């Protein structure tokens, strides 16, 4: 803001970081302060698949809405593919109900034999019954665990996605700490909607956000290097001399 106030255009400013999940905190502040930005070689934090999935589970608990339902009903796989979803959509239109209610009503239908539909409904009902009494951070951790979502990511070996979920949990915890008594699930979901619907008018005068890897061979007038702390940069995965050398090379790229 100080630089911009002195006449520097946003596009001359670049923020570098070691790992993608760092962007969450930077993005939240930039959005709050109305600083335009663009992420290079990465997806905005709240638009990442695993973040959208996690938030869809929370929305399903609170609202049981169709968009959230379609996003996670078969993630992880529950054998609820296109044919069964089409059946639910037709039923929902005919009976003017939500897809979730359509599924709940038809659990005994032959079409859902051999699926995990009943377990899915039981899971959501279990959380929906008492979510208002639980902390959002605890709710999030529990649903990601009990739904099998985190296990699915571990099985796939998606460490970056797990790191992003850990960052989401941290952001929920920070949100609770700042809101105190007012931190209801509904309140949080409307707060987070501000970040997920961020399609501000596109003008190219934006601060660039990118990893140090992406910045190799590039130069910018103003560079901010953030989160240079032990465990982030150098990465917590640095357990050999060779890996530490690689971290040093990356730091050199960032500085030069």
Where are the predicted features?
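Conserved, well-folded catalytic cores of nucleic-acid-processing
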Residues: 2-6, 29-36, 57-60, 64, ...
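Coupling/hinge elements of helicase-like and P-loop NTPase modules
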Residues: 1-12, 94-107
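Conserved motor-region signature of P-loop NTPase helicases/translocases
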Residues: 1-68, 155, 159-160, 207, ...
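Accessory C-terminal helicase-associated subdomains
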Residues: 68, 76, 105-214, 218-219, ...
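Structural motif
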Residues: 222-224
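C-terminal helical "lid" of AAA+/P-loop NTPase domains
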Residues: 86-92
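C-terminal accessory regions
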Residues: 227-256
């Amino acid at each position: 803001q100080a630089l911009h106030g002195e006449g520097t255009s946003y596009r001359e400013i670049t923020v570098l970081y070691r790992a993608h999940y760092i962007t969450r905190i930077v993005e939240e502040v930039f959005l709050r302060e109305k600083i335009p930005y663009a992420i290079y070689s990465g997806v905005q934090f709240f638009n990442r698949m695993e973040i959208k999935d996690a938030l869809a589970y929370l929305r399903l608990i609170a609202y049981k809405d169709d968009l959230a339902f379609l996003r996670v009903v078969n993630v992880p796989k529950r054998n609820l593919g296109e044919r069964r979803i089409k059946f639910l959509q037709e039923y929902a239109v005919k009976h003017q109900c939500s897809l979730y209610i359509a599924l709940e009503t038809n659990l005994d239908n032959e079409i859902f034999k051999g699926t995990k539909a009943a377990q899915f409904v039981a899971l959501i009902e279990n959380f929906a019954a008492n979510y208002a009494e639980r902390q959002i951070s605890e709710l999030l951790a529990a649903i990601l665990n009990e739904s099998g979502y985190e296990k699915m990511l571990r099985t796939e070996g998606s460490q970056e996605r797990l790191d992003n979920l850990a960052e989401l949990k941290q952001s929920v915890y920070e949100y609770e700490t700042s809101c105190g008594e007012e931190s209801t699930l509904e309140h949080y979901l409307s707060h987070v909607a501000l970040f997920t619907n961020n399609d501000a008018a596109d003008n190219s005068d934006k601060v660039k956000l990118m990893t140090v890897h992406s910045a190799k061979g590039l130069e910018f007038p103003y560079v901010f290097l953030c989160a240079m702390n032990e465990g982030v940069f150098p990465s917590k995965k640095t357990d050999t001399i060779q890996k530490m050398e690689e971290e040093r090379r990356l730091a050199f790229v960032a500085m030069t």
